Amino acid sequence: MKKITLLLGMALTFVLTSCSLIFGNKMTEKDGINEAKEILEKEQPFAGKEFYKVRLHTGKPLEDAFKGVTAVFKDPENEGKYISQAYWKIGKLQNPQEDSVSDNLTPFKVEEIDTDMVVKDAAELYKFLENNEELKDFNRFNVRDMTIIKWK
């Protein structure tokens, strides 16, 4: 009986530790944000670029697992136009699209994204919604998209 309980416990532990592999890392937690940063650092056409906007996505409403990232950057190969390009974890790089950028934004590198600050801001947003009586209907919602920008 002890052996069965031990095996069941080990199986349950495996399932719990594998959940992030099955469902993905939460977008509003450090692992999800670091996963997005890794894509932007290593995958083409993002590697080495400066970004004006970085959007993290879950993919569907009511999900909170990180599924993809969209970045807006200036593309020297495309006459210096602003390009928006998405990368989804299922391995699909979307076609680039022309985009526009506000004059109030300044470009930034991936290493400038403060993961701890993004996680803290997301936690503060949840707490604000939890504690605000007028917004109580939004309590227990999931963040579907997050945009990271740098103001001038």
Question: What annotation goes with each model-predicted range?
Answer:
Residues 1-4:
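Positively charged n-region of N-terminal signal peptides that target proteins for export
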Residues 6-11:
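Sec-dependent N-terminal signal peptides
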Residues 15-18:
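C-terminal motif of bacterial Sec signal peptides marking the signal peptidase cleavage site
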Residues 20-22:
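Bacterial signal peptide processing site
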Residues 29-46:
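Post-signal peptide N-terminal segment of mature Sec-exported envelope proteins
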Residues 47-81, 147-152:
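Exposed beta-strand-loop-beta-strand "reactive/processing" segments of non-cytosolic proteins
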Residues 51-54, 133-146:
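Surface-exposed patches in mature extracellular/periplasmic domains of secreted proteins
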Residues 90-139:
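Long, charged/polar, surface-exposed segments that mediate recognition or autoinhibition
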